[in-house]
């Protein structure tokens, strides 16, 4: 159902069963998939592609220009998967040509009120962004990561899968998979064991991850020496391989 008071560009492509509430504005070069619900007073600009079964609440701004002073109106994109929820006043920006030109959001994510995803970010699946999370540009967030309220993330940071960021954390370094961090600046506070249990990790897998955490953070080893030990463990433990691969891909150093 399209409310008569909504303003929709003739160039927008909406599936027949999309719902758009009153006073929302859908711009040209926007594609919205089946059963997606756009609430009242929402703005969606493009080029933006939104998948199926998404829910966008009032006052959200989806797919507008990046907040980057170098941006000069280039035709960059935003791509959103399926079954995401964007609560009140979320802001999700398109990419820039200084990166891949696209901001990417996976599926089954929850973005609570006033959360902000900046240009060129890559968000995985099943993440939670609590109220007023603020992301810099070019940030990567792995699957199942949870970011508490008022978390602030510096540009180019990588947050690993299953990581947990406590409320108010200020992050300027990469967070490895499975690790909990909190504080300003954010520092590690152990393994997100409860989250791993809820997602079906076995006791043995969690024990291996705890062992890896001790090697990385509690052994007084240099990072290169810790990485050598972790690499040996990863040969038979896929959950440790994910940690090793993340460390190799880190460009801003790890929280310590």
State what each model feature region is.
Residues 2-182, 186-187:
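Structural signal for interior beta-strand "rungs" in well-ordered beta-sheet cores
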Residues 1-5, 10-11, 16-17, 53, ...:
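Terminal amphipathic alpha-helical/low-complexity segments used for targeting or macromolecular assembly
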């Amino acid at each position: 159902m399209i409310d008569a008071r909504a303003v929709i560009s003739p160039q927008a492509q909406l599936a027949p069963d999309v719902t758009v509430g009153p006073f929302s504005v859908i711009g040209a070069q926007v594609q919205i998939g089946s059963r997606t619900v756009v609430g009242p007073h929402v703005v969606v600009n493009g080029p933006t592609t939104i998948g199926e079964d998404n829910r966008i609440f009032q006052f959200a701004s989806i797919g507008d220009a990046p907040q980057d002073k170098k941006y000069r109106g280039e035709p960059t994109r935003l791509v959103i998967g399926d079954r995401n929820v964007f609560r009140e006043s979320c802001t999700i920006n398109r990419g820039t040509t200084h990166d891949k030109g696209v901001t990417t959001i996976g599926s089954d994510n929850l973005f609570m009120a006033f959360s902000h995803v900046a240009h060129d970010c890559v968000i995985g699946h099943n993440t939670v962004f609590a109220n007023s999370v603020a992301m810099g540009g070019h940030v990567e967030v792995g699957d199942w990561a949870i970011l508490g309220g008022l978390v602030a993330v510096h540009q180019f940071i990588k947050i690993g899968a299953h990581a947990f960021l406590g409320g108010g954390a200020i992050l300027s370094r990469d967070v490895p998979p499975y690790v909990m961090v909190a504080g300003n600046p954010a520092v590690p506070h152990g393994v997100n064991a409860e989250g791993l249990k809820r997602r079906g990790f076995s006791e043995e897998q969690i024990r291996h991850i705890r062992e890896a955490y001790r090697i990385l953070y509690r052994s007084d080893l240099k990072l290169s020496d810790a990485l050598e030990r972790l690499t040996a463990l990863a040969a038979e433990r896929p959950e440790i391989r994910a940690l090793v691969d993340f460390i190799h891909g880190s460009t801003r150093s790890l929280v310590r």
